[in-house]
Amino acid sequence: MERAVQGTDGGGGSNSSSRSSSRATSAGSSPSCSLAGRGVSSRSAAAGLGGGGSRSSPGSVAASPSGGGGRRREPALEGVLSKYTNLLQGWQNRYFVLDFEAGILQYFVNEQSKHQKPRGVLSLSGAIVSLSDEAPHMLVVYSANGEMFKLRAADAKEKQFWVTQLRACAKYHMEMNSKSAPSSRSRSLTLLPHGTPNSASPCSQRHLSVGAPGVVTITHHKSPAAARRAKSQYSGQLHEVREMMNQVEGQQKNLVHAIESLPGSGPLTALDQDLLLLKATSAATLSCLGECLNLLQQSVHQAGQPSQKPGASENILGWHGSKSHSTEQLKNGTLGSLPSASANITWAILPNSAEDEQTSQPEPEPNSGSELVLSEDEKSDNEDKEETELGVMEDQRSIILHLISQLKLGMDLTKVVLPTFILEKRSLLEMYADFMAHPDLLLAITAGATPEERVICFVEYYLTAFHEGRKGALAKKPYNPIIGETFHCSWEVPKDRVKPKRTASRSPASCHEHPMADDPSKSYKLRFVAEQVSHHPPISCFYCECEEKRLCVNTHVWTKSKFMGMSVGVSMIGEGVLRLLEHGEEYVFTLPSAYARSILTIPWVELGGKVSINCAKTGYSATVIFHTKPFYGGKVHRVTAEVKHNPTNTIVCKAHGEWNGTLEFTYNNGETKVIDTTTLPVYPKKIRPLEKQGPMESRNLWREVTRYLRLGDIDAATEQKRHLEEKQRVEERKRENLRTPWKPKYFIQEGDGWVYFNPLWKAH
């Protein structure tokens, strides 16, 4: 069949980019046009390009009927992209060809070698194409068999074009494979070995020899009687395939059992990296084969009964993938302890719950603020504040590898129970309280003389709040709060430390805790309460108020974690509202995302994303951007901010620096101010002793887990955590049987948000 090419830029134009732009060679419509119309169906090879051919911008290929039958044909997308090869060679330019009809992405060393054997081929059926912030204009293509291409385009436009075409191709072939239906004319579905070119026409495919090696042809016949005969014939063959797969499944189970029966120490253990990879690969292979068998069964069934939908008949064989030890227990939400030299770590994917099987306790008491007013019982917090700055130990790395082998890219980790050794010795609710470690800056907001000064004070406080809440650079995960869990504390701030921004004269201070005032009458009291109000989704609420300064903060946060390969991302969905009752102002703010990087070596944390601060009454707003570190070069923990007066479109303040280091503020009058977060005074929380805390207060609830983590006894900590989880499951089942809805103790749902039951703005 004739293949023709049509250029669109006069035949001799060139792309101004240093790297050649992606181009589509076509005898038909452009990729964008054709994909919008009817999806990908066939490929037009690049041919007849004199002197390298025309260089057209993406999507600019003209549409014209092909010679011969007038049938519109889809182009093959070609162009130069940078591919990440290895750690030593880094990024290298390679010539890529996207074959729409075959559904493959292949690359060559350069354009001249594209008629030779490709250097690499990636099947796009069922592939995932995602964007990445590791490098500029980067995209990652993950095939269904686990292979991966890390690619970079010349610019954002080219990147988006490639992403669009790759995703469309992947979607098209996935739909064709899973939703194939018999057409009105006879056609064949041919399964060829990997890499075999499928150039035969539909007619020639029907006459392929049955004995041809490596070729299996399933023919959809026009005659219903012939279709029924073929169905009976192939159904019997599929029965044989199913029996064979059942045998392989049993062998794979034996393999997994043999691996997991190995001793916990010695030259070969159950956590050997090669054995973990073997387990994961064998399970994934069986799963893929099972999907293929299901597709074949649907095709045979549809050939005989074209009017019925796939799966409508009970005669279709059922095989749902490998039921290996690991896979089966993952689905059931249970997995036995993994042998380890120093720890028995239990983790499981839970059906409808967050990390610690967030479940309910018996119905709480009616809303009551009694625990907030018992401030005479509170004492200065003397808990250890720093996590041990150690990397991942070898046996722990093996456990994490085992965990990663069971996860999929983009998987929601709120449904995964993580190993105990990665947990931080505090609850997420307490971590929110630690964001208030500089209460003097918070209370100074209301002391501002003008709306401009107050919004700038809030931005200063906001940017300095995160470093203490993170407790060092080591990325560890706080306990996921259990529904009904609460945390209470307070701060005493000397009144002479709370001053407006322009008049505040801060002498150099150490980063040690700031001493409390001896006379309570000379201090402001800042109270804090947090509660876990929901477990699906996991929503935490916290409320903070200073009655004397008539200031309060009400916040609700939904944490959503996601697996990103060698890192974990946590989105903080929700918002907070700072109310200055003295001025009648409300500042609505959002929170950044957090990322745990290098989870297999020395994990570290960074913040990322764009957040906003808005005050509708005054017209002031602020935009804060937490910059994540680029793949190559760049600084970590960088943040920039801009405060704007919207009615006049005037920028009144800019800030830049590091959220856990030095921040520099520049005001519109030319003044500058530098804040070093490492030298800011830290005010310790005041918290009641454990013996005076309720059973659902964070430290009392997790006390045994925390104690064993401090002792380094991971086995005992895991056992205590498991005991706590099981207790919550029992209470949850009771609540479900009684159909009793959970009623939070301190917060009330209003619309999509949650509000403290007795806030300062309602009491005054």
UniProtKB/Swiss-Prot annotation:
Q: Which residues bind a 1,2-diacyl-sn-glycero-3-phospho-(1D-myo-inositol 4-phosphate)?
A: 413-418, 477-480, 535-536, 721, 725, 729
Q: Which residues form a coiled coil?
A: 713-740
Which GO molecular function entries does the Swiss-Prot or TrEMBL record give? cholesterol binding; phosphatidylserine binding; phospholipid transporter activity
Phosphoserine modification sites are 29-30, 57, 60, 64, 201, 209, 223
Omega-N-methylarginine modification, residue list: 38
The annotated regions of Acidic residues compositional bias extend over 374-389
Give the SMART domains listed for this entry. Answer: PH
Quick one: which residues bind a 1,2-diacyl-sn-glycero-3-phospho-L-serine?
Answer: 413-418, 480, 561
Q: What does the UniProt keyword field contain?
A: Coiled coil, Cytoplasm, Cytoskeleton, Lipid biosynthesis, Lipid metabolism, Lipid transport, Lipid-binding, Methylation, Phosphoprotein, Transport
Q: Which cellular compartments is it found in?
A: Cytoplasm, Cytoskeleton
Among Pfam families, the record links this protein to: Oxysterol_BP, PH_8
Which residues does the record list as Phosphothreonine (modified residue)? 196
Q: What is known of its domains?
A: The C-terminal region binds cholesterol, 25-hydroxysterol and acidic phospholipids and is required for localization to microtubules. The PH domain selectively interacts with phosphatidylinositol-4-phosphate.
Job description of the protein: Probable lipid transporter involved in lipid countertransport between the endoplasmic reticulum and the plasma membrane. Its ability to bind phosphatidylserine, suggests that it specifically exchanges phosphatidylserine with phosphatidylinositol 4-phosphate (PI4P), delivering phosphatidylserine to the plasma membrane in exchange for PI4P. Plays a role in negative regulation of lipid biosynthesis. Negatively regulates APOB secretion from hepatocytes. Binds cholesterol and acidic phospholipids. Also binds 25-hydroxycholesterol. Binds phosphatidylserine.
Q: Under which name does UniProt file this protein?
A: Oxysterol-binding protein-related protein 10
Species annotation: Homo sapiens
Point out the gene that encodes the protein: OSBPL10
